[in-house]
């Protein structure tokens, strides 16, 4: 499936403030982005997921005008990223895994340096974030651990009350306790921000995201609300009579199918109670029991990634 599939909810559609249309990025003979198309509505938390090399960081860099697209259109707040100005940048907070921070300054000194650039800077919010994330304001940034530097970047990205917060692999290399602290502090302070987050830590994303886009080999395989994705993907166990045979071929929406003894297991990517039972009993003889279990974002991703690689999506 080469084009993104947008699955919309029943709520009133928000304004799209981040968008890409037929976006391509070439590095020599390598196409990092291949006709990428998607949009992010204001007030949503959009998780950009995909395997290493899928193009997640490249997408973010094009949106931020850190890379020029080879062709196509990328825009933030309706302004093409090629023409993004300090006015638009002032409405964006940005945190990345390898973000450069001035190591010679203390946390407090760096915050004091940033404040004059943002008339909307909220000192009360800054203070509460320093407290919640337990950041040592008097320590030099170069002396902080990796986790503390990521926390510092987050405290620098939110107090000016941006409309859009971009997080590029913010949890990479952090131990579970620091990740939990970071996610907890972030969720308390994010408010009504629009968020674009790219991360391999899918369990953390699941607690933040309202929408998800699955990127593979530079293409958006699908884009939809998180609630819809977790509703339509179920792990299914079909118990058959001992003499029953598993039919072939199986429906294309049944991924990662395997049989263990008299139990057929698969992931149904178009699940509904009524259609699953009807389809299973039509295809399989001797059906004794059908069980469908919810899946985490991580388990969905580990099923969809190989399917995308093999051209099964």
Residues covered by each model-derived region:
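ABC transporter nucleotide-binding domain
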Residues: 180-271
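C-terminal coupling/interaction segments
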Residues: 2-9, 268-313
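ABC transporter nucleotide-binding domains
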Residues: 15-20, 25-216, 220-222
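Short loop/turn segments at beta->alpha junctions
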Residues: 106, 225, 293-296
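A generic structural signal for alpha->beta connector loops
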Residues: 120, 138, 192, 253-254, ...
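Short, flexible helix/strand-to-coil boundary loops that buttress conserved ligand/catalytic motifs
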Residues: 105, 230-233, 304-305
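Non-catalytic alpha-helical coupling and interface elements of nucleotide-dependent molecular machines
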Residues: 116-119, 234, 306-309
